[in-house]
Amino acid sequence: MHSPRKLFHARSSLATRRSTALVVLTSLAIGIAGFTFGLAVILIPGLRLTGRNCLTNTPPKTVRVVWDVAGNSNGVVSGEKKRHKVMGFVGIQTGFGSAGRRRSLRKTWMPSDPEGLRRLEESTGLAIRFMIGKTKSEEKMAQLRREIAEYDDFVLLDIEEEYSKLPYKTLAFFKAAYALYDSEFYVKADDDIYLRPDRLSLLLAKERSHSQTYLGCLKKGPVFTDPKLKWYEPLSHLLGKEYFLHAYGPIYALSADVVASLVALKNNSFRMFNNEDVTIGAWMLAMNVNHENHHILCEPECSPSSVAVWDIPKCSGLCNPEKRMLELHKQESCSKSPTLPSDDE
C-alpha cells in the first residue's frame, strides 16, 4: 500500500550551558551545509528531484529506464535507487500512435493528474503508469515530451517502440517496474481495455499459498504457421500444433517472486517468440509458477464482478478503443457499480 510519510523530529539539546560562540559557530555550519546541499541539488544531475511531486514521499512518476542493447546485463535504471512500496504496479503498454487512447483512459478510469494518481494509489494500493519506448522521429519525441510535461504519468523505456519488438518491450517493462517499485504483483495491461482498479486490487490481494503466481484469462489455441497472418509464429516448429496454456495479452500479472527471477537473468538468455503473450507463457512453463485463470479479466461487457472489459474475441482489446472507452464509462454498470457485487446479484 501507500508508504506512510516519514517524519523526522530533531531532539532539543539537554545541555543548558552553551557558549554564545559555540551556538554561533554551529548555526553557521548548519547554514553552510544547507547552502551546499541546495547548490548540489541544482548543479549535480544525480541529485536533482524530477517530476511534479518532489515534495511528497512518492517517486517521480516519469522516469527513464536504460535498456542494455548488448544483452549482457539485466538492465539499469537511471534515477532514484530506492524502490517505492506498493501492493501492485500496473504498467499500461502504449505507443506513439496511441495519444488518443491515452486521452480516453484519462477521461475514464485512469486519473489525469498526479494528485488523482496518488489518491488512487492510497485507496487501492495500485500505482499506474504508461510504459513507452523511444523512436527516431524527433517530432514524435517532442510530442511525447509535451504530454509528459502536462501529465507526468510515464515510464520511458530505452528500447525502440516497434510492434515486432513487443516481447523485448515486455521484458524491459518488468525489469524497469521491479527496479522502481517494491510490489507484490506487476500487472501488464494494454491501453485499449476498460479497467476497474478497485476490483483488480481485490484480486491481487487474495491470500495465496504459492508465492510464484501467473494470473490472467488463460487460453490455448492453434499455432499460426501462415506468414500472411498477423499472429504468425516463425518458431512454430518448436511449439507443435497447439499453444500451451497462457494468458491473453491485454492484461495479466506476475507476482514479485516471478519477476525477481526474470530480473536476475541476462537479457540475451530469453527465448523470444513472435507474440508477446506466448513469450511470457513459455517463460512461465520453465518456472515453478501457479497458473490462475480469471475470466473476470476478459469480459466483453461490464458486469458486477468484471475487472477488465474488452471486445473478446473480435479484437485483442476494445474495438475502436478511443470511442468505446468513453461509451463504457457512461454506463453505470461500468463506472458506478460497487466494487463488490451485492447479495442480490
UniProtKB/Swiss-Prot annotation:
TM regions (residue ranges): 24-44
Keywords per UniProt: Glycoprotein, Glycosyltransferase, Golgi apparatus, Manganese, Membrane, Signal-anchor, Transferase, Transmembrane, Transmembrane helix
Membrane topology of the entry: Single-pass type II membrane protein
Residues annotated as glycosylated: N267
Record has Oxidoreductase as a keyword: no
Biological process, per Gene Ontology: protein glycosylation
Residues annotated as signal peptide: none
Pathway per the UniProt entry: Protein modification; protein glycosylation
Catalytic activity, EC: 2.4.1.-
Membrane found in the keyword field: yes
InterPro entries assigned to the protein according to its UniProt record, in alphabetical order: Glyco_trans_31
A single cellular component GO annotation: Golgi apparatus
Family recorded in the similarity comment: Belongs to the glycosyltransferase 31 family.
PANTHER family membership: BETA-1,3-GALACTOSYLTRANSFERASE 13-RELATED, BETA-1,3-N-ACETYLGLUCOSAMINYLTRANSFERASE
UniProt name for this protein: Probable beta-1,3-galactosyltransferase 14
Annotated organism of origin: Arabidopsis thaliana (Mouse-ear cress)
Gene name of the encoded protein: B3GALT14
